[in-house]
């Protein structure tokens, strides 16, 4: 019985690897992962074989976000509080973001549609802490092309409190992006629309109710 369980786990893990590899082959923006203690894994655009690398300054047990260009070159990464460039050096203004290194999904990074030089870091603080959900803009023309966080568009609050979960998906129009988070204490998902015009925090979000309320260990 244990043998069959182990075989099932191996098969499941193998299918996940194949699925992830196929996704990465289609979009180089997710081809570099940095996590844990100084660890990283990279997929070249021409292959689905991962290559391990070290040297990152990161030390964390929880969430990290990375972003690469369509040619699979690492651009920058963040643990929700600090931001490092492709050379593993902290950006000049890449500090003090209101996420948390102890947040399970501390940040997600997305490109601004139709603008190859602008990215947004959406951060979620540790459960129910004051940072909540916020965003900061990264200008890739700054810092000699290595990018920097725009001090005039940094830690822009969206809502609070928020849980530690966040994700992003493409809009059905193939251009825009939805950033999705769960609200605290209810069953609402909040979807924030990012377009070529930027982020509309007044009219650019949809609230959907489904599932069970998120209220700590008794929720999702």
Residue ranges, per PLM feature:
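Beta-propeller fold detector
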Residues: 92-95, 145-158, 200-211
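Structural signature of eukaryotic scaffold interfaces centered on beta-propeller domains
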Residues: 26-27, 59-73, 98-117, 158-176, ...
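Structural motif
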Residues: 39-47, 83-87, 127-139, 186-193
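Bacterial Sec-dependent N-terminal signal peptides
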Residues: 1-30
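Blade-loop segments of beta-propeller domains
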Residues: 60-63, 74-132, 148-155
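Short loop/turn segments immediately following beta-strands, especially the blade-tip
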Residues: 137-148, 192-201
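Beta-strand-rich domains and repeat architectures in extracellular enzymes and scaffolds
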Residues: 26-78
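Beta-propeller domains
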Residues: 173-220
